[in-house]
Amino acid sequence: MTTKQTSYIFVSGGVLSGLGKGVVAASLGFLLQNRGYKVGVIKCENYLNIDSGTINPIEHGDAFLCEDGLEADMDLGTYERFLDYDMGHCNFTTIGQIYKKVIDRERSFGYKGEDVEAIPHITDEIISRIKKAGQGHEILIIELGGTAGEYQNMLYYEACRIMKAKQPNRIINVHVSYVPLPQHIGEPKTMPTQLSIRTVMSMGIHPEFLVLRSIAILDKRRRYLLGLKCSVPGNNVVMSPDVKSIYEIPLIFAQQKFDKKILKELNLSYRKSNLDEWHKLVKKISKPKDKKVKIVIAGKYFATGDYELSDSYAALIEAIKHAAWHLNTEVDLKFINTEDIEKQGVKLIGKPDGIIVPIGWGSRGAEGKISTIKYAREKKIPYLGLCYGMQLACVEFARDVVKLKKADTTENNPQTPYPIIHDIPMSSKYQTIKGKNTSMRLGAYDCYLSDKTQIAKIYKKYKFCKKVSDIYKKKNNITAVGNCVISERHRHRFEFNNEYRDILSKHGMIFAGTSPNNMFVEMIELPKKIHPFFIATQGHPEYKSRPNKPHPLFIEFVRAATK
C-alpha cells in the first residue's frame, strides 16, 4: 500500500502533560483496528536523546523495550497492549534522531550545497518518517509528544500543517485537552482548553476533534458551547473522563461513536465491529475479586521530591495487573526504596505475599536489593527477579548459601574476588553498540529451558514456548540443554559468570534456561522443596504481557502469592 492511500490522524495535547494522549491514540487505534482497518501508530518525542534508553525513568517514565531492541517512550507499551502487536523503530522518533539524520546527511554532501534549515529540511525528515511508518497501513495515528505551545515540538506541528495543506482530505487533527473542575468553584472551567486551541490554531492547525480529559463527563450544553468557541462541531467534542482502568476508554469512545465520526471525516467506509471480547475484559477487571495479595516492588526509581511515581515501573505494574485479573485477585502494591532498606533494614518489607526486584543499574540501592532477596529466600516468600533482580539473586546466593562472602558484580565492585556477574564482551556479536564505550544486549533473544524445571512447566502450561527436536539443535549448532524454546526481551550489559555455574548448582541453584549457545544464563530457580516460588530471569517478561494475554511467569507468581 502506498502512502497516498494512508489516512493520517494527528493527536496533540494541551494545558498540561500526562493527559493520556497515548491512551487516546491507542484506544482510537484499537476501535479502528476492530473495524478491520490496518492501523499503525508512531510517537514523536521532543527530546534530543536518540532513544529513551539513557533517560532516568524518574525523568520520563519506564523506557519501553521493544522486540527489535528499541528503547522507547512508555506510550509504545500502551500501543502494544491495546493493539496487540509488536512495536519497533518505525513506531518511534525523537527530535534528536531527526537532527542527527539531517546533520549526518549535510556532512555527507547530501544536500548538494543547499543552505540547510529547520524548514524545510527538518520538517521534510519528520514527514518522511511519518510516511514510512504509514507504509502498509490504511490509517496511521501520530501522537505528538509534549504540550501545545512548547518550543521543543513546534517543528512537529509545522510538519503536520504542511501535510494537511498537501493532503487535506487524508489528514485530521485530534486535540486532547484538560478541563479542570476546581472544588471551590464547583463547575468545570473551559478557558484553559480555549487557550490551548488558540495556540494550536496559531500554528496553522484547526482540529476536527476535541477530546476532553476531566474528572467527569461534561454536560451536552457545555460541550456544545466549548466546541463553538473552539471552532469544533459540538458532535466532535468527545469526553475522556477519569476511570478506574484505562481499558474502559475504548468502550467510552465507542459509546460516543468516536471511531464512526473519524471514519466519516476521512471519507472511509464503515466496517462492522465486535467489542465482545473487550467488554469481557472490562467486566473481568471490574468484578469483585475472590482473593487479595500484597506485593512488594523493591526498587529505587520511585521518589521525585516529596512525591512517589509509579511510571518508572509502568510495564511491570501492568503485567502484575494482567495476571491478577486472570486469577480474579486484587493486588495491593507496595513500593519500597531499597536505599531505605540499607538504612533501616528489612523490617520495612513487612509480611508481603510476594516480592519483586525489577530492573536497575549501578551500586545505589544494590545492597538493599540483595537484603530483600535474602529476606524473600529465607522467609520463603514468593520471589520474582527481573534482569538486575536475577543478577543480584545469584550474588545473594553466592554470598549466603555458597559462603563466597565477597561475591559481587563487576558493575558495582570491579575488584571483587568472586565476580558472579561480569561484563558481556564488547562485540556486536553479543551486544548493540550504542556509542563510545556504550553497549547493551537489547531486544528479543531465544532461550532454551531445561525440560523438567518449574519454569519450563510454566511456559508449556500456557503454550508460550515451542518444542524443537535434537536433530534441529544439532543442525543449528545449539548446545543448550532442553528442547523447549522461548523468547524474551533483554536490556543489560552484564551477565552471569559461567565460571560459577557448577558451584552454585552444587548448592541447589537450578540454571533453568540458557541462550542457544549455552553462553548466557537466562533463567534460574530454586527447587520447590527449598522454596515455594523462587524464579528469576535475565529477560523482561513484563514488556510482553497483554491484558488478554498475561505473561505465564506473572500468572504463576501471583498464584503463588495467593497461597
Where are these regions (language model features)?
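Cofactor-cradling patches in redox/metallo enzymes
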Residues: 358
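Repeat-solenoid scaffold signature
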Residues: 377-393
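Glycine-rich, charge-decorated loop segments at or immediately adjacent to ligand/cofactor-binding or catalytic sites
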Residues: 182-189, 391-400
